[in-house]
From Swiss-Prot:
Protein's UniProt name: Sirohydrochlorin cobaltochelatase
InterPro entries recorded: CbiX-like, SiroHydchlorin_Cochelatase, Sirohydro_Cobaltochel/CbiX
Family: Belongs to the CbiX family. CbiXS subfamily.
Lineage per the UniProt record: Archaea, Methanobacteriati, Methanobacteriota, Methanomada group, Methanobacteria
Reactions catalysed, as given in the entry: Co-sirohydrochlorin + 2 H(+) = sirohydrochlorin + Co(2+); Ni-sirohydrochlorin + 2 H(+) = sirohydrochlorin + Ni(2+)
Binding site for Co(2+): H18, H83
A GO MF label: nickel cation binding
Pathway assigned in UniProt: Cofactor biosynthesis; adenosylcobalamin biosynthesis; cob(II)yrinate a,c-diamide from sirohydrochlorin (anaerobic route): step 1/10
Organism: Methanothermobacter thermautotrophicus (strain ATCC 29096 / DSM 1053 / JCM 10044 / NBRC 100330 / Delta H) (Methanobacterium thermoautotrophicum)
Recorded name of the encoding gene: cbiX
């Protein structure tokens, strides 16, 4: 029996941000990635949908170059919207050609990536008690 048959695929994590001409969002997403990396046992990359670098395809290529076989993509957005439901899946090649109703182009959407492994796309952050705790802390510090 092959000893590799029971091995799990090498996993990478891609945190996706919107991107901006201003540096603040990029700094926050990179800061979140740095915190996550401290306890992660797999490679972590950051990619941006628009206006910032690295783009989502560039980040996928970065993870692929590390030999990952499965990429878990997490949008660092609070809620679903056009970007999480249409634009990001389209960039990831997960939309099966669905057009949606969003008709402006994004700077990175025509870039390609070289990855033939599995891509798993997660939900955005959502209504999570940990986010409510952050809000409580902000309110408490402002009182």
């Amino acid at each position: 029996m092959d000893s590799n048959s029971n091995q799990k695929p090498k996993i990478g994590v891609l945190l996706v941000g919107h991107g901006s001409r201003l540096p603040y969002g990029e700094e926050v997403i990179n800061g979140i990635a740095d915190i996550y990396r401290q306890e992660a046992d797999h490679p972590v990359a950051v990619g941006f949908m628009n206006m910032s670098r690295p783009s989502i395809p560039e980040a996928i290529n970065e993870l692929a170059a590390m030999g990952v076989e499965k990429i878990i993509v997490t949008p660092v957005f609070l809620a679903h919207g056009v970007h999480t439901k249409h634009d990001i899946p389209h960039i990831l090649g997960l939309d099966n050609g669905a057009e949606g109703h969003h008709h402006h182009e994004h700077e990175h959407e025509h870039e390609e990536f070289e990855f033939d492994g599995e891509i798993v796309y997660t939900e955005p952050l959502g209504a999570d008690p940990r986010i409510a705790e952050i809000i409580r802390d902000r309110v408490k510090s402002a009182i």
